[in-house]
């Protein structure tokens, strides 16, 4: 008789990571969740496999596969079954907030009749070939998730010296039309040196009234001590910033400024030269040297690129505010590039649905993603040292 070798789940998960590095994280997660689900079933039954005991409530009845969309891609878990009781492992029921928000967006599209091939394909992988969903089921699940996300969006804020503001657009169904809605995002660096996602909002545009309402909501939650705002040059945001935080200086994003300069330079070779000149200005050791280099560049541009010179005379000084802050902080404060990770992840996550069924669905997914990112930042390393 052959000897049966028991595989330790922790060893199997470790082996997956050892063999494939972070690429094996999905397999490690699958192994550990499967084991956690089996342990939870044993606790529910009041008995381990094959154990005879008077405390047993029911009997194990095999497993059913379930495919879940996670940040590691599609993972198929083995869901433990029981004979006659209502049991489901909590690890698989909950999932991550972002995964739930993505799946709810698809489910909302389905029950509202937006049954595109892509939506059907994904839901069939999640729920099986026979999709059985009702509006009531989807509404209950959405309400449960929204409660926690609303609490996160409305949590108290505090001392936040540096405030980053940005927006991106998502396609949303609104009053029978498909419109581009602005997703307003605020990220801050707290006095502790940690980055935090401060809030988000879905609006019909980046008009002043929307940015103003968003900024006022941050102040109402306790945001204070802001010494610098880092943002791109947008008329609505600029007007709202002046109205709500008039005394706080503004650092214009240097990265987007360089992109704008490139559009005002016709020849490719000249574009490279202008980019190098702008980098020299931005990388200057202090404001005095930066202003000297800018003055020299403007003299050249007036002759060779008059349109660029006219624009740069007012635009570039708006990107030099950072020189009034500690040298050790400047590299973190020059651009809004730190928000690009958020935008990349949002693009990846929204690709499945492509069009949100309503603004609430869009806000739910954005909030879930940002809440998870905020958790990472809160427990991670200090981003900026205020006490060198």
From Swiss-Prot:
Origin, by domain of life? Bacteria
Give one GO biological process term.
Answer: DNA transposition
Q: Name one GO molecular function term.
A: DNA binding
**Has UniProt tagged this entry with the keyword DNA-binding?**
yes
Q: What keywords appear on the UniProt entry? A: DNA recombination, DNA-binding, Transposable element, Transposition
Q: Which family does it belong to?
A: Belongs to the transposase mutator family.
- The protein's role, per its UniProt record: Required for the transposition of the insertion element.
Q: What is the name of this protein? A: Transposase for insertion sequence element IS406
């Amino acid at each position: 008789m052959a000897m049966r070798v028991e595989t330790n789940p922790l060893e199997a998960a470790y082996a997956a990571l050892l063999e494939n590095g972070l690429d094996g994280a999905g397999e490690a997660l699958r192994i550990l969740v499967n084991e956690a689900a089996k342990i939870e079933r044993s606790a529910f039954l009041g008995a381990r496999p094959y154990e005879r005991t008077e405390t047993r409530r029911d009997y194990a009845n095999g497993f059913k596969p379930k495919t879940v969309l996670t940040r590691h891609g599609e993972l198929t878990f083995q869901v433990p079954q029981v004979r006659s009781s209502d049991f489901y492992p909590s690890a698989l029921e909950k999932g991550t907030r972002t995964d739930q928000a993505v799946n709810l967006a698809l489910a909302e599209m389905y029950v509202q009749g937006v049954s595109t091939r892509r939506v059907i394909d994904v839901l069939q992988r999640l729920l099986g070939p026979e999709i059985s969903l009702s509006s009531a089921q989807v509404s209950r699940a959405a309400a449960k998730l929204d409660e926690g996300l609303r609490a996160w969006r409305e949590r108290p804020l505090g001392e936040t010296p540096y405030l980053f503001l940005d927006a991106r657009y998502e396609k949303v169904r609104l009053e029978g039309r498909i419109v581009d809605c602005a997703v307003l995002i605020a990220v801050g660096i707290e006095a502790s040196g940690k980055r935090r996602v401060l809030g988000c909002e879905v609006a019909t545009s980046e008009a002043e009234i929307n940015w103003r309402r968003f900024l006022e909501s941050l102040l109402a939650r306790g945001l204070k001590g802001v010494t610098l705002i880092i943002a791109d040059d947008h008329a609505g945001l600029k007007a709202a910033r002046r109205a709500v935080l008039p005394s706080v200086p503004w650092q214009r994003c240097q990265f987007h400024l360089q992109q704008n300069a490139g559009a005002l330079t016709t020849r490719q070779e000249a574009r490279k030269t202008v980019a190098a000149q702008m980098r020299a200005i931005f990388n200057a050791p202090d404001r005095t040297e930066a202003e000297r280099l800018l003055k020299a560049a403007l003299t050249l541009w007036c002759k060779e690129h008059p349109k660029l010179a006219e624009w740069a005379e007012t635009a570039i000084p708006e990107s030099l505010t950072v020189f009034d802050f500690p040298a050790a902080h400047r590299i973190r404060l020059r651009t809004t590039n730190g928000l690009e990770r958020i935008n990349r992840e949002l693009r990846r996550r929204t690709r499945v649905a492509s069009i949100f069924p309503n603004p609430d669905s869009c806000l739910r997914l954005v909030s879930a993603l940002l809440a998870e990112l905020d958790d990472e930042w809160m427990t991670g390393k200090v981003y900026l040292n205020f006490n060198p």
